[in-house]
Amino acid sequence: MNLNAPFSPQPPLAAEHLPLTLMRLDDWLPINVSGPDAQSYLQGQLTADLPSLAATQHTLCGHCDAQGKLWSSLRLLRRRDGFTYLLRRSVATLQMLELKKYAVFAKASIVSDEGAVLLGVAGAQASEALGALFPRLPDADAPLLQAGRSHLLYMAWPQPRYLLICDDADEAERIFAPLSARARLADSAQWLALDIESGIPLIDEPNCDSFLPQAVNLQALGGISFTKGCYSGQEMVARAKYRGANRRALFWLRGSAERLPHASEDLELRLGDSWRRSGTVLAAQRLADGGVYLQAVLSSDLPADSVLRVRDDARSQLTLSPLPYSTDQQE
């Protein structure tokens, strides 16, 4: 069966209303890094501390330029004989080009895994449905599990959900066939909406090379090591922590809008009877009920009762929603 055919676009649902849902995550791409120098090379490029990454863990992290600005946020794990990271497909070509710049001096191969299939499973009874296909599932204590030709990643927010990296289409079909009989089918938009609810930073091409990792909450999410030593952009990232150079943070907004803003657009903040341009949109989704979810980078000291709107949209109203984690800047 052609796995693309059933995954037709449809408006996303909020996590609290989501039935068992199977998604094909074509808007994300896995990149494999292998070779004798894979770990040491990535250690000098990414914000995470790779030697401390256990085989049962996955982590968010960032890849920065020399000024500490993010080429992309990544989800990193050990896979096969090296590492795999997941990122938004729109930024993959540019990010890989930057990552490969100095790889000529290392025994490390960096290739996109176009043969792999990424699936998402979320919603009511997601654990029970996957448990019928796998003898064990990842959980909060060990959120990464290899099961044959699949790697299963557990994510707790906004409700327990799973991302599956299937080695090939045959493995994806093995999972798809039984699940599709009982699950709602959706495309990447549903997973993106869940990431917005979760406060997981979504860096697409228009926002590439724009933000320090702290500005998209990577420090609050445990995605930055300040003890690992040098990596690309490390000095500027450390300065943002120790000198308070960063005054921005990632927020989840929801409300109404006549139109969806594009990534990199600014919003408008209500100040009395007037509006002032503020912040940068990272991602936006319109839900099935007509409401809007936005992820945006705004001033970190923005009052919790602030009201914003989509630029030049007089009928729009957006308010801040709490994230499922503390935004205190911890390592």
UniProtKB/Swiss-Prot annotation:
This is tRNA-modifying protein YgfZ. Folate-binding protein involved in regulating the level of ATP-DnaA and in the modification of some tRNAs. It is probably a key factor in regulatory networks that act via tRNA modification, such as initiation of chromosomal replication. It comes from Edwardsiella ictaluri (strain 93-146). It is found in: Cytoplasm. GO terms for molecular function: folic acid binding. The lineage of its organism: Bacteria, Pseudomonadati, Pseudomonadota, Gammaproteobacteria, Enterobacterales. Folate binds at W28, W191. Pfam families: YgfZ_barrel. GO terms for cellular component: cytoplasm.
